[in-house]
Regions:
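Short, threonine-centered small-residue motifs that mark membrane-proximal processing/anchoring sites
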Residues: 3-13, 17-19, 23-29, 178-205
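Extracellular carbohydrate recognition
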Residues: 169-178
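Extracellular distal adhesion/interaction modules in secreted or cell-surface proteins
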Residues: 28-157
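Short beta-strand-plus-loop segments that form exposed binding edges in beta-rich domains
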Residues: 119, 163-170
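Extracytosolic secretory-pathway proteins
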Residues: 154-166
């Protein structure tokens, strides 16, 4: 009985540590680096996909820790055939993609998200990390969802990336290809190790209990 108690106590400590580690991972979010704040244009040159919302121009998207990112195609209003790439691979095209199409990226360490937009081509015209803050050239706008699902928050775990292909005439309405991004936590290796330790301990206790019943 004393041995089982000690094992259960160790399992409890392992599970507690796992939960604590997972909590710290879940606190990781995507943030913006650089750029300036403002609102997408209104009027005839307004955004036809997300409307006029507050957000960031010329900013880069940075992951604070290990994350899984899901990108969702929301739509476009553009004459050119624009593209969205993840890890250098074509994922969305305004010629073929449909609302709700998804793509994923796994981020294993803090750093820039690895996506790019192509202006009337399937190769990058603007890459996250080199997003200019001037209009008239390919660039993108970022806005975050708040807890109620409204765009315009300063930061968060979900938002939109809206592309301006810099086409002529330059309208800076950022609806030439729009995607939503949603991030979720990825447990670090130490977390998985703790969880496996806990499961192994539970299995050992169950095995010892069955052995005693068989002997009895």
């Amino acid at each position: 009985m004393g041995v089982q108690y000690k094992l259960l106590r160790r399992i409890g400590l392992a599970v507690t540590a796992s939960i604590a580690l997972m909590g710290s991972v879940q606190a990781s979010i995507v943030t913006t680096v650089g750029g300036s704040t403002g609102t997408v244009a209104t009027g005839s040159a307004g955004n036809d996909v997300i409307g006029s919302v507050f957000g960031y121009f010329g900013s880069q998207l940075f992951a604070d820790g290990p994350l899984r990112v899901e990108y969702t195609y929301l739509g476009k209003e553009a004459g050119d055939t624009n593209s969205f790439l993840v890890l250098g691979n074509l994922q969305f095209s305004t010629a073929t993609s449909n609302y709700g199409d998804t793509a994923n990226e796994l981020v294993l360490a803090p750093g820039l998200l690895n996506f790019a937009f192509g202006a009337n081509q399937n190769t990058p015209s603007v890459i996250n990390g080199f997003n200019p803050g001037t209009s008239g050239v390919p660039n993108f706008f970022v806005s975050f969802y708040d807890q109620f699902g409204n765009l315009g928050a300063l930061t968060g775990n979900s938002g939109v990336i809206a592309f301006d292909d810099g086409g002529s005439p330059a309208d800076a309405d950022y609806d030439d290809l729009v995607v939503r991004f949603t991030v979720s936590a990825v447990p670090e290796p130490t977390t998985w190790a703790m969880m496996l330790l806990g499961f192994a301990g539970i299995g050992l206790v169950a095995y010892r209990r069955r052995s005693k019943l068989a002997l009895g």
